[in-house]
């Protein structure tokens, strides 16, 4: 639309074409520039996505600093997961002296359906694949767990022969020289991707590119794919509804859940996206016991249900 000669990018990983009118950058890059230059900055307009991070205890400063230190800059603040923002607008007007105009969002183009299941993760994936619900993104809240699931699913015959051949061709030119790279190469050959912030950029970008081409039926990763990355996913599977936030185990906030779930449903491909939440392990085990007992009253009475582990939230 604007032409390559007018577009640049600055991230923590790379810098491309910086002396141009339009720069795409991370929130932290803009915040650091605002701290360096302050009101003297020549940034005329900022389109700030994922504005719900304004309240995040770790990254929120990067959304706050530009608003408070760039008084001559016009801002467009966007979020797909905020509710009533009247109070936020009033607070911004109070702190910046600028007028805030509210734009109500349009309905979601691809509606979502939700399911809460007590099947094992492998069983859930198998049912989803059989039901034509691929591609799947399986969300974990640790990098090790994502890799463990990927290695487990790689033996399930996830990809077709045609997909495996296309993946092999598309991955040509990528160096898999590291220990993790060798593991990833094997997983990709089975149609299973891995995606998290701890990966080298070349591996992460390859997984995103393969997903965009529709070659990966399953991606196992963390909630990083829910932020700022455009990858077509039909079904999101959450392995848990709790996470460790650096201080304690807690339930996902509504915003976090909707941010992750919002990746389901491919515009232009799907009439509906699917979001599946896995029950905790003790609930899954109890469901197995109930199913095994069937309708037999004696067997049902003898069931000793597993309790939630200590500290479970």
What residue spans do the PLM features occupy?
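SF2 helicase catalytic motif II
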Residues: 23, 27-76
């Amino acid at each position: 639309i604007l032409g390559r000669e007018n577009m640049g990018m600055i991230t923590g990983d790379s810098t491309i074409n910086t002396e141009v009118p339009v720069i795409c950058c991370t929130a932290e890059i803009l915040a650091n520039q605002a701290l360096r230059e302050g009101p003297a900055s020549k940034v005329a307009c900022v389109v700030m996505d994922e504005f719900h991070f304004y309240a995040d205890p770790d990254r929120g400063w990067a959304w706050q600093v530009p608003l408070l230190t760039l008084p001559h800059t016009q801002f467009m603040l966007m979020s797909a997961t905020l509710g009533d923002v009247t109070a936020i607008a009033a607070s911004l007007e109070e702190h910046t002296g600028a007028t805030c105009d509210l734009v109500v969002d349009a309905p979601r183009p691809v509606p979502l359906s939700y399911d809460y299941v007590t099947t094992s993760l492998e069983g859930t994936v198998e049912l989803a694949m059989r039901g034509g619900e691929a591609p799947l993104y399986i969300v974990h809240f640790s990098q090790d767990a994502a890799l463990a699931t990927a290695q487990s699913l790689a033996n399930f015959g996830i990809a077709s022969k045609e997909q495996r051949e296309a993946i092999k061709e598309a991955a040509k030119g990528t160096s898999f020289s590291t220990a993790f790279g060798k593991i990833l190469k094997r997983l990709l050959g089975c149609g299973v991707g891995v995606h998290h912030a701890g990966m080298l950029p070349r591996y992460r970008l390859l997984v995103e590119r393969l997903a965009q081409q529709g070659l990966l039926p399953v991606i196992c990763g963390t909630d990083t794919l829910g932020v700022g990355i455009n990858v077509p996913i039909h079904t999101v599977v959450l392995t848990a509804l709790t996470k460790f936030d650096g201080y304690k185990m807690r339930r996902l906030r509504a915003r976090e859940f909707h941010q992750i779930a919002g990746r389901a449903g491919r515009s232009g491909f799907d009439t509906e996206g699917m979001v599946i939440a896995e029950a905790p392990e003790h609930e899954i085990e109890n469901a197995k016991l109930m199913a095994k007992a069937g309708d037999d009253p004696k067997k049902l009475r003898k069931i000793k249900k597993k309790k939630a582990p200590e500290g479970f939230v």
